[in-house]
UniProtKB/Swiss-Prot annotation:
Sequence positions that bind substrate: S89, H189
GO cellular component terms given for this protein: cytoplasm
Superkingdom assignment: Eukaryota
Role this protein plays: Catalyzes the decarboxylation of L-tyrosine to tyramine, which is converted to norbelladine, a precursor to all Amaryllidaceae alkaloids such as galanthamine, lycorine and haemanthamine, and including haemanthamine- and crinamine-type alkaloids, promising anticancer agents.
Organism field: Narcissus pseudonarcissus
Similarity-based family: Belongs to the group II decarboxylase family.
Entry protein name: Tyrosine decarboxylase 2
Cofactor section: pyridoxal 5'-phosphate
Binding site for pyridoxal 5'-phosphate: A153, S154, T248, N302
Pfam family, one: Pyridoxal_deC
N6-(pyridoxal phosphate)lysine found at: K305
Length: 500
């Protein structure tokens, strides 16, 4: 007769966890040996795994070997020091240890009573971060506001939009939904458009305002004022503005002070999305980029991007938590308890879309305690310095140009097209990106700014050092030389750049 399954045996955990930590540590020691961008073809894994799950147990050694041989080749290595695509997704020893503890407890902290420590630690740690960022006191839990950990900035944007929507519907009536107008620039993350779709905002009432090179792709206050005036004249209700500190395409910074004043005059909900660049604002020399946050109703940043905290961990602060709670709260009988009914505790289920939630504050707490503010500031500054060095390398080669001035650790640049080039270098840079990524030596991503195909070089991986910056630049130079030598610049193909 088979032994009964003991899925959480302490000694088995001890033995296997040691093996798993060794496996992960070995992965990090050898991470530079892998192509940064996975080189597999779509559907590669289907032929490598059985058609059905096993009937009987297999050994951990066999599973780990399959990970080495079958899974790792299909991994794009976000933690590689040669990863420069999108924006970073940081990991660290502290963050990893926090994830381990969270997985060990495996609580589902939807309300206070479900695990008091999970709720209370989150409140405390978000207050710590608010003070590190020098946010106004209204964002602290001691007043009417407070902070909460969401999964992603997309969730943060959605919940504050829902809170704002319901606040205005309560004021103007449920039938006024068709009149509510949302404002953002064309550089705002696409998550805002999705949030509007989910919130039922009429598509024609999502104002996407043009931001171009004349403002370094920041939202122009005059454009916002004009759009609001036109909508008011048409009998519509301007109610929500999303500004960005560190846009996805170019790390542009919207002018918060001026936008905040416009929002205040028009009694709008002003939200600031600093998913990427918010982390830099713990450094005094970068704090001015969120000057004007005083007028914001809500603010978010992703600790999992550039703050050494493993994914997922998006931080959201709000000045009036009652707006979130009124929009998102539910009180089924099976969740009622004395502490909640007496309003003596925070129930974070009412600050988010799902009911269940992980103990995410543990890893953030571990990062803050094991590294401290000074080390975190140095970490940010080093990446910005490395990006500055890469920018100088670009400027030193007359074949390239920096497309927008660098603000943080993102460099936007392109290879200049030969004279009389038909598409202004679009295909040329498309091909350069494809060649660089196909080499497996580095991974970068792209955007399009004012019709120009632009390569984004985002410094932020925890293991990246100066040598990796220099090596990456050599890859660009070598591939550019090959491209320019092989054609007159009039026709460049790109086999798979559209999906990179």
């Amino acid at each position: 007769m088979e032994e009964s399954l003991k899925p959480m045996d302490a000694e088995q955990l001890r033995e296997n966890a040691h093996k798993m930590v060794d496996f992960i540590a070995d992965y990090y020691k050898s991470i530079e040996s892998f192509p940064v961008l996975s080189q597999v073809k779509p559907g590669y894994l289907r032929d490598l795994l059985p058609d059905s799950a096993p009937d009987h147990p297999e050994s951990l050694e066999d599973v780990l070997e399959d990970i080495r041989q079958k899974i790792v080749p299909g991994v794009t290595h976000w933690q590689s020091p040669n990863y420069f695509a999108y924006y970073p997704s940081n990991s660290s020893v502290a963050g990893f240890l926090g994830e381990m503890i969270s997985a060990g407890f495996n609580i589902v902290g939807f309300n206070w009573i479900a695990s008091p420590a999970a709720t209370e630690l989150e409140v405390i740690v978000l207050d710590w971060l608010a003070k590190m960022l020098n946010l106004p006191n209204q964002f602290l839990s001691s007043g009417q506001g407070g902070g909460v950990i969401q999964g992603t900035a997309s969730e943060a944007n959605l919940v504050v939009l829902l809170a704002a929507r319901d606040k205005f519907l309560n004021r103007f009536g449920k039938r006024s939904l068709e009149k509510l107008v949302v404002y953002a620039s064309d550089q705002t993350h696409a998550a805002m458009k999705k949030a509007c779709q989910i919130a039922g905002i009429y598509p024609e009432n999502f104002r996407v305002l043009n931001a171009d090179h004349t403002s370094n792709y920041a939202l122009v206050p005059e454009a916002l004022s004009d759009a609001i005036s036109n909508d008011l004249s048409a009998g519509l209700i301007p109610f929500f503005l999303c500004a960005t500190v560190g846009t996805t395409s170019s790390a542009a910074v919207d002018p918060l002070s001026e936008l905040g004043k416009i929002s205040k005059v028009n009694d709008m909900w002003f939200h600031v999305d600093a998913a990427y660049a918010g982390s830099a604002c713990i450094c005094p020399e970068y704090r001015h980029y969120i000057d004007g946050i005083e007028e914001a109703a809500s603010f978010n940043m992703n600790a999992h991007k550039w703050f050494l905290t493993n994914f997922d961990c998006s931080l959201l602060w709000i000045k009036d938590r009652s707006a979130l709670i009124q929009s998102l709260s539910t009180y089924p009988e099976y969740l009622k308890n004395k502490a909640s009914q007496e309003n003596s505790v925070v129930d974070f289920k009412d600050w988010q879309i799902p009911l269940g939630r992980r103990f995410r504050s543990l890893k953030l707490w571990m990062v803050l305690r094991l590294y401290g503010l000074e080390n975190l500031q140095s970490y940010i500054r080093n990446h910005i310095k490395l990006a500055g060095q890469f920018e100088q390398l670009v400027c030193s080669d007359s074949r390239f140009e920096v497309v927008v001035p660098r603000t943080f650790s993102l460099v936007c640049f392109r290879l200049l097209p030969p004279p009389n080039h038909q598409d202004n270098g679009y295909k040329l840079n498309h091909s350069l990106l494809d060649a660089v990524n196909s080499s497996g030596k580095i991974f970068v991503s792209h955007t399009v700014l004012s019709g120009k195909y632009v390569i984004r070089f985002a410094v932020g991986a925890p293991l990246t050092e100066e040598e990796h910056i220099k090596q990456a630049w050599k890859v660009f130079q070598d591939q550019a030389t090959i491209l320019l030598a092989g054609s007159d610049g009039s026709d460049f193909g790109a086999s798979n750049g559209d999906i990179i």
